Amino acid sequence: MAQFFKAKPNSSKQLSAKQSFSVQQLDHLGAGIAQHQGKVVFIPGALPNETVQAQLTEQKKNYARAKLIKVETPSTERVSPLCPHYHTCGGCDLQHMSLTAQREHKSAALVDIMAKFAGAEGSLAPALSGEGWHYRRRARLATLFDKNTKQLSLGFRASSSSHVVSITECLVLAKPLSDLIAPFAKLLNQLAAKSSLGHLELIAADNGHFAVIRITKSLNDKDMAKLAQFAEQHQIHICLQDNEGEFHGVNGTLLLPVYQLLDDKTDVQPVSLTFTPGNFVQVNAQINKAMVAQALDWLAPQPGERILDLFCGMGNFSLPLARMGADVIGVEGVPEMVSQARENAVANGLSNLTFYHGDLSADLSSEPWMGKIDKLLLDPARAGAYESLQWLKKMKPRQVVYVSCNPASLARDSAVLLERGYKLQKLGLIDMFPQTHHIEAMALFELAK
């Protein structure tokens, strides 16, 4: 029998068709989840209990993705985004959801991920939460020079794109810094070297406001004078970062930003953290203080106890732990941050604190700090602390506090702790980035008796 050609369904038509979807829940990235022809469909911008009109943009074997076109039946938790740049800027992705609902979703997602991938269940601590707007004390804005218009754009990159979205304000950035965006855009466009400028970093510290401008070639005297005048007019410290990574104050002196780590309400002597622009620091001052206070409460450091702080950075947790009287060892993989941490220990008058540089993904058996400890604090990057946890038997801490910026790696590493005889005692959300899907958490593990 002759076999005739049978045309395949036109996939482009399938992808371009607008369809109605009923959204059941959110995934951990904040996208709405619906079902369509036996597949899970992810729809960014959609909320649970909504009926939406969306357009399929990607078809895979077991799932699909769609672009939200219209909300037909809105959720009671849907709110109007406050930011005029929300739908183009890639910075925030949950402004369409009430702040209360955001936090409920994040807490539920955290518990779900821990239960599903680690089989871990512990007492859920109250979420660490604060202001929903103007909470960022630091931001890096991208620049883009248009060779045709000879204009420099200042803003954030669009989601999953290198395109720079020009902005005039940022509602999650500290108000004094947000108010500087438009004036800075005007200033930078007046410079002769505007085609040679990189990013602009804005910092609100406890000792003033700072701006760091990345340059690819030296600025002439007129440009330097304009920057110095702007700095004086707006009461901001401006420094330039050259191709070698060195920083130079526009007025000839370089002042470093300083943050306070302990809440003013504590009875403990203050602890300050001095850092160089470019070093990693937590961007939410209110939540960082609450996070440090909670870590101190959960670990309850005592004089004479040996506490190890892995991935310690410049001492965000190490310094307060030492202030409480414990003998603290901090280990960090970035040499410059170790040097800054040591300087911070001296500046705070702490002699019961030692910092080491080390690769925490390598063999740690011969490290001078490796050995029996009383308690362990982990604050790794998104990749987690899996390799470091392989040395638990040698360290034998009674308690482990794990601070995580990625619930997936936290769940994976929690499974290691459970296998080593630890029990999850407490788990809590850290809402470091309101208006975004990002989930941070703190977990307390104790060695079973």
Curated annotation (Swiss-Prot):
The question of whether Lipoprotein is a record keyword is answered with no
TRAM domain segment(s):
12-70
One GO term (biological process): rRNA base methylation
GO molecular function terms noted in the UniProt entry: 4 iron, 4 sulfur cluster binding; iron ion binding; RNA binding; rRNA (uridine-C5-)-methyltransferase activity
- What does the record give as the active site? 405 (nucleophile)
Q: What EC number(s) does its UniProt record assign? A: 2.1.1.190
Q: Does the keyword S-adenosyl-L-methionine apply?
A: yes
Which Gene3D superfamilies does the UniProt entry name for this protein? 2.40.50.1070, Nucleic acid-binding proteins, Vaccinia Virus protein VP39
User: Any idea which UniProt keywords this protein has?
Assistant: 4Fe-4S, Iron, Iron-sulfur, Metal-binding, Methyltransferase, rRNA processing, S-adenosyl-L-methionine, Transferase
Q: Which InterPro entries did the record assign?
A: 23S_rRNA_MeTrfase_RlmD, MeTrfase_TrmA_AS, MeTrfase_TrmA_CS, NA-bd_OB-fold, SAM-dependent_MTases_sf, TRAM_dom, U5_MeTrfase_fam
Q: Where does S-adenosyl-L-methionine bind?
A: 282, 311, 316, 332, 359, 379
**Root EC class:** transferase
Catalytic activity field: uridine(1939) in 23S rRNA + S-adenosyl-L-methionine = 5-methyluridine(1939) in 23S rRNA + S-adenosyl-L-homocysteine + H(+)
Q: Name the positions where [4Fe-4S] cluster binds.
A: 83, 89, 92, 170
Looking up Pfam families in the UniProt record yields: TRAM, tRNA_U5-meth_tr
Q: Which family does it belong to?
A: Belongs to the class I-like SAM-binding methyltransferase superfamily. RNA M5U methyltransferase family. RlmD subfamily.
Q: What does this protein do?
A: Catalyzes the formation of 5-methyl-uridine at position 1939 (m5U1939) in 23S rRNA.
Q: What is this protein called?
A: 23S rRNA (uracil(1939)-C(5))-methyltransferase RlmD
Gene name on record? rlmD
